Regions:
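N-terminal Rossmann-like NAD(P)+-binding subdomain of aldehyde/semialdehyde dehydrogenases
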Residues: 1-57
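Rossmann-like NAD(P) dinucleotide-binding subdomain of oxidoreductase/dehydrogenase enzymes
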Residues: 51-134
Length: 134
């Protein structure tokens, strides 16, 4: 899981520029958001690799459960990505329906982390956002 940290560290500028283009926040804000997500990935990977400390805690995912995320286009990507990282580290697969207005940041993250995860563990779904009423 520390690969998430490495991947985001190696692509901070690229992700920040994409976030700026897509959601309209300043590059400075985007760099800060990506940096905070990167640090959360690092902290989560460190937490899950700590040796037991006398009190036995165990994270046991329940088979067949999937976490779904439906963020709005203007919801801070940073918060969504932190929750996704925590969910993946806890052992649950994730399905994220990217907002039709801002899918590129989520698709880029998925592309970066995909080589380090088993197939089907992190999924991003996109759509045009249009529905047809019958």
């Amino acid at each position: 899981m520390s690969r998430f940290y490495q991947v985001t560290r190696d692509n901070v500028t690229k992700l920040a520029e994409l976030l700026t283009q897509e959601s309209g926040i300043t590059i400075r804000s985007a760099l800060g958001a990506v940096d905070r997500v990167r640090k959360k990935f690092f902290l989560a990977s460190e937490f899950y690799s700590l040796p037991p400390s006398g009190i036995q805690n165990e994270i046991a995912p329940r088979h067949g459960r999937i976490a779904g995320f439906l963020p709005s286009w203007n919801f801070p990507h940073e918060i969504v990505l932190q929750r996704i990282a925590e969910t993946l580290f806890a052992g649950y697969p994730v399905v994220l329906k990217a907002p039709s207005e801002t899918p590129l940041t989520y698709l880029s993250i998925a592309k970066l982390v995909d080589p380090y995860l088993p197939k089907g563990v992190f999924n991003v779904i996109t759509s045009t956002g249009k529905t047809k009423h019958q």
